Amino acid sequence: MSAPRKTRLYAILAVICGAVLTVALTLYALSSNIDLFYTPSEILYGKNETQEKPAIGQRLRVGGMVMPGSVRRDSQSLEVRFTVYDAQGSVEVTYNGMLPDLFREGQGVVAQGILDTDDHIMAKEVLARHDENYTPPEIKAAMEGQHGHAPAAVTEGKRL
């Protein structure tokens, strides 16, 4: 192989290796910013047929309804604890900060944070639905057939 061909081959290999490295580093950086959406029952029992549960420490978003009577505020700080439920289960959410003005018991909510235990989320952000006629598509699909009421087992404080 002649010298110019070797030089050209090395240059092409260097460009390909650089492109592969760039793509790999970009995908690695983006993976830490992905927040998967779960309903309370998917956190407890896993998603669909795969029964894949989120791992402890995983960043995620949970959507559902705020259980009436579950909101507890700390008198010494901005910490708020509440329960988010859907048709098959409920999870506890802890949030330290100012809640949105439209946050209410019995309303739809999406909490973004880290799964602390099997049924507890430490939220970094809480979003409340902003219009009485609007429900985010993820929550609407998860709550279908439930008519906005907590199932009896959930309202009695049982984990389904």
Curated annotation (Swiss-Prot):
Its main location: membrane. Heme binds at H130, Y134. The chain crosses the membrane at residues 9-29. It is a single-pass type II membrane protein. GO terms for cellular component: plasma membrane. InterPro entries: CcmE (IPR004329), CcmE-like_sf (IPR036127), NA-bd_OB-fold (IPR012340). SUPFAM superfamilies: Heme chaperone CcmE. It comes from the Bacteria. Residues 1-8 are cytoplasmic. GO terms for biological process: cytochrome complex assembly. It is found in: Cell inner membrane. GO terms for molecular function: heme binding; metal ion binding. HAMAP family: CcmE. This is Cytochrome c-type biogenesis protein CcmE. The gene is ccmE.
